[in-house]
Amino acid sequence: MEALGGYPSKSSASRAGLFKVLLSVALCMGSLYLLQNKLSKSRKTKDFYSYEVKDARGRTVSLEKYRGKVSLVVNVASGSELTEQSYRALQELHRELGTSHFNVLAFPCSQYGDTESGTSREIEAFAKSNYGVTFPIFNKIKIMGSEAEPAFRFLTDSVQKIPRWNFWKFLVSPEGQVVRFWKPEEPVSDIRKEATTLVRNIILKKRQEL
């Protein structure tokens, strides 16, 4: 029904105003839901093993498979002055502590000069054929800048340090938290002590649960 002169009645205007209010409320509620959902997801990703990465062949790998074990995460390179000694020491540590409770996880990075120019599969083949590497080598990543690999960014954020060169090493607990990190020049013998202690704790805990 229209009022005289063709203007909308007061009831029509009221309904239009009410509709606008309800629409605004619905939009606000929707925005809040999306924000809450986003925050909820971000809270769930709170440790290293919560992330997914790519292997050398580009396949998605959930780091959850390493939960419950000790991990030594390293940014590796094929053409560095540290390559041979580092790969050999890492392989020895990986073999010594065994894959039941410990793993070296290698992430190639090409942001440090020309020390890593090959493809991920070439890097993997190089490490295996030259140094007998049996630990996993993942897809080549970026560590610095806005395109940094999220899993590796978790490590650097945890220690508030960004690697300045190849072969920085991050020791990750069975729960996915960073225990300590080492610069390239620091001896692997120091890492061995820390990693061995964590592995022993895992074994003791399992024995107590029997």
UniProtKB/Swiss-Prot annotation:
Protein topology in the membrane = Single-pass membrane protein
Superkingdom: Eukaryota
Database matches in CDD domains: GSH_Peroxidase
- Main localization category: membrane
For this protein, the record's PROSITE patterns field holds: ER_TARGET, GLUTATHIONE_PEROXID_3
Tell me, what's a Pfam family for it? GSHPx
Membrane-crossing ranges are 13-35
Which reactions is this enzyme annotated as catalysing?
2 glutathione + H2O2 = glutathione disulfide + 2 H2O
**Annotated GO MF terms:** glutathione peroxidase activity; peroxidase activity
The record's listing under NCBIfam families reads: gpx7
Can you say what this protein is called? Probable glutathione peroxidase 8
Question: Source species, please?
Answer: Danio rerio
